[in-house]
Amino acid sequence: MEPRISLVTLGVTDVARAKAFYEQLGWRGQEVEQTVFLQAGGMALVLWGRDKLAVDLGLEHGSPPGFTGVALAHNVRSQPEVDEIIAAAQGAGATITRSPSTTFYGGYAGVFVDLDSHAWEIAHNPGFPLAEDGSLTIPDFGSVQTAKRTP
């Protein structure tokens, strides 16, 4: 298996409502047979009916849980971008679960949940610089820790 993710599919209760929410945040996509495909760099974010997704995965469909054990993250290049995106999400109807603040890792982040309770962390992490195209490469943590210990 190649180490990459091609799609992240979010099970939603109302595809049209979810599409409108993400469009208010600047995402653009295509809807095909009640499924929305949003380009996200080199991968796709997919919005699909929660019940249909459960059937497709061979899982039981129940009511949306409070915490699913999954968090999505969107890294940005500056602290002001975190504030702007969190404000835009709130304006689009999201619930802010953690207001933007300094993090334990020296960054700055806030968290919102979308209209279907999917958690999104919006973060500026100086230890994870973004390339010009927005891609992220995991740093060599060994050299980062060594550098932090050097006076």
Region roles according to the model:
Residues 1-17, 69-74, 126-151:
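N-terminal beta-strand motif that seeds the catalytic metal site of vicinal oxygen chelate
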Residues 2, 9-54:
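Core segments of cupin and vicinal oxygen chelate
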Residues 4-13, 36, 59-151:
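Vicinal oxygen chelate
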Residues 50-63, 129-131:
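Short, flexible, glycine-rich and Lys/Arg-enriched loop motifs at helix boundaries
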